[in-house]
């Protein structure tokens, strides 16, 4: 029986690469996107052509209601065996003093709150089955940082 994974931020970059690896291993993949619809649909078609079930699911993980709906839609493919949180955005390259409250909240909303909301939504599915894995991913910004002062 095939396994099922939900990958947030899966339309491009690290998320898309992660989706390709899971699909190559035979996993069915739910690809979350927020703005990159065409890229997500193209990736779903690419993965499906390789013999796995792949679906593109729109949702802003920084919104708890959308994160809940996203997990439920992904679970309709089959029991979720894994969640991989790749969704992330970054501040523009600017001085910290030029960063607006809105910019800061948006980044924290996606990069921090989004991880919490999707994990919280998927946990009941995994606890009920007494199995499942959650992986959180960061880009190199999480290691190298940047100068903003």
Residues of each region from the PLM?
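Substrate-binding pocket helix/loop in short-chain dehydrogenase/reductase
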Residues: 94-96, 103-105
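The beta1-alpha1 cofactor-binding region of Rossmann-like NAD(H)/NADP(H)-dependent oxidoreductases
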Residues: 37, 58-70, 101
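Conserved NAD(P)H cofactor-binding loop of Rossmann-fold oxidoreductase domains
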Residues: 86-92
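Conserved glycine-rich cofactor-binding loop
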Residues: 11-12
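Residue(s) in the substrate-gating loop at a strand-loop-helix junction
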Residues: 139
